[in-house]
Amino acid sequence: MQITVMKGKIHRATVTDADLNYEGSLTVDMDLVDAAGMRVYEKVSVVNVNNGARFETYIIEGKRGSGEICLNGAAARLGMKGDKIIIITYAQVEEQELASDYTPKVVHVDEKNRKR
């Protein structure tokens, strides 16, 4: 049987911008994307710690080392600059293949979205 498990997480990133007029998605600094084992265009769940909003979108490439976390398109209505968010990816795995020591990649960031 397949189960869905958390694959990666960027924990308590700070939203640096929100662009309602962009076509959609979530712009994320590529250093954070790589550290969390995520990919550009991968589906993500986003949880806004400040207002409780939860939504799904996909990642687009942000400049490396910029700390950029930008809510684009309709997602811009679900958060604002300065909000803390959690970005989560998932994977489908065969339950019997899931190692007992499985650990997802979790990236903790500081107030400027630099990996701690």
Curated annotation (Swiss-Prot):
Details of cofactor binding: Binds 1 pyruvoyl group covalently per subunit.
Physiological role: Catalyzes the pyruvoyl-dependent decarboxylation of aspartate to produce beta-alanine.
What is the protein's name according to its record?
Aspartate 1-decarboxylase
Its gene?
panD
GO biological process annotations for this chain's record? Answer: alanine biosynthetic process; pantothenate biosynthetic process
The annotated subunit structure for this chain is:
Heterooctamer of four alpha and four beta subunits.
InterPro entries tied to this protein: Asp_de-COase-like_dom_sf, Asp_decarbox
Which cofactors are required for activity?
pyruvate
Tell whether NAD is among the UniProt keywords: no
Q: Which residues bind substrate?
A: T57, G73, A74, A75
Pyruvic acid (Ser): residues bearing it: S25
Name the domain of life this protein comes from: Bacteria
Query: Where does this protein reside within or beyond the cell?
Result: Cytoplasm
HAMAP family per UniProt: PanD
Write out the pathway annotation from the protein's UniProt entry: Cofactor biosynthesis; (R)-pantothenate biosynthesis; beta-alanine from L-aspartate: step 1/1
Per the similarity annotation, which family is this? Belongs to the PanD family.
Q: Which GO terms describe its cellular component?
A: cytosol
Query: Main site of residence?
Result: cytoplasm
Cite the post-translational modification comment.
Is synthesized initially as an inactive proenzyme, which is activated by self-cleavage at a specific serine bond to produce a beta-subunit with a hydroxyl group at its C-terminus and an alpha-subunit with a pyruvoyl group at its N-terminus.
Q: Please state the Enzyme Commission number of this protein.
A: 4.1.1.11
Q: Where is the catalytic site?
A: S25, Y58
GO-annotated molecular function = aspartate 1-decarboxylase activity
Keyword annotations from UniProtKB, A to Z:
Autocatalytic cleavage, Cytoplasm, Decarboxylase, Lyase, Pantothenate biosynthesis, Pyruvate, Schiff base, Zymogen
Q: Does the keyword Secreted apply?
A: no
Q: Which reactions appear under catalytic activity for this entry?
A: L-aspartate + H(+) = beta-alanine + CO2
Species annotation: Leptospira interrogans serogroup Icterohaemorrhagiae serovar Lai (strain 56601)
